[in-house]
Design a protein with these regions (language model features):
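N-terminal interaction/assembly modules
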Residues: 1-132, 136-165
Length: 165
């Protein structure tokens, strides 16, 4: 199973948990029972291959992070979706953005550009072109507003430390 497929499963799992109002970890336990996963494979080719341990860990970690940081992520979406309230954004688009934001903020093994690109590519399978562009814009603004200033501050601190030595 590729990371892209694992990411799409994580987005679907996060979406399902959020829609049901359930803890993502409990939803994942049900989702990844071999019997249930097999029934999903009958309906959607995305589920044809059961994830290996590495991909299963990635999916569980990402969905857990989305669940744990839901309030913060929703706030970030509204902040960078200027003029849009979360209620006006499709639930699928919001789920895609939450997962990408979690990868950017909390998963060091995923480069920011890769998280955005993967989110945009996955959105193309679910959303209209205008919404795909919207997702790209929100995530780009998010990185410029939240992540890059932190990286610049860290670089300045490192330079000051080197200068003092």
């Amino acid at each position: 199973m590729t990371r892209t497929v694992a990411r799409e499963i994580a987005i679907q799992l996060s979406f399902a948990a959020q829609l049901a109002g359930d803890d993502a970890r409990e939803t994942a336990d049900t989702f990844f029972s071999r019997e249930y996963f097999a029934t999903l494979a009958e309906e959607d080719p995305l589920f044809l291959e059961y994830p290996d341990e590495k991909q299963l860990d990635y999916i569980r970690r990402l969905t857990g992070l989305v669940y744990d940081h839901m309030y913060e992520l929703n706030h970030m979406i509204e902040k960078y979706a200027r003029g849009w309230r979360l209620e006006r954004i499709s639930r699928v688009a919001a789920a895609i953005m939450r997962c990408a934001m979690c990868e950017i903020l909390y998963m060091d093994d995923v480069p920011n550009a890769a998280a955005i690109n993967e989110a945009v590519e996955l959105a193309k399978g679910y959303e209209e072109p205008e919404t795909v562009a919207f997702i790209n814009g929100v995530l780009g603004s998010f990185v410029r507003g939240e992540v890059e200033p932190e990286a610049e501050a860290e670089e300045e601190t490192e330079e000051e430390t080197k200068t003092e030595e």
